[in-house]
Amino acid sequence: MDHRLLEIVACPVCNGKLYFNKENLELVCKADNLAYPVRDGIPVLLENEARPLSIDEKHA
């Protein structure tokens, strides 16, 4: 994931910072506990495409 892109994208729910999870290929919003998929290198920043983080992921 391009670090320049991470500097300008934001969570569509709260406008918070997103963090790239390289293992799962997702952008994670820790404030909302949501993970947005990255498909073919393109972030899918749609709330209905996000998945809730598990309890373990929240505390990682």
UniProtKB/Swiss-Prot annotation:
**Name recorded for this polypeptide:** UPF0434 protein YE1549
**GO CC terms for this protein?**
cytosol
SUPFAM superfamilies, per this entry? Trm112p-like (SSF158997)
Superkingdom: Bacteria
The similarity annotation says: Belongs to the UPF0434 family.
Kindly name one Pfam family recorded for this protein. Trm112p
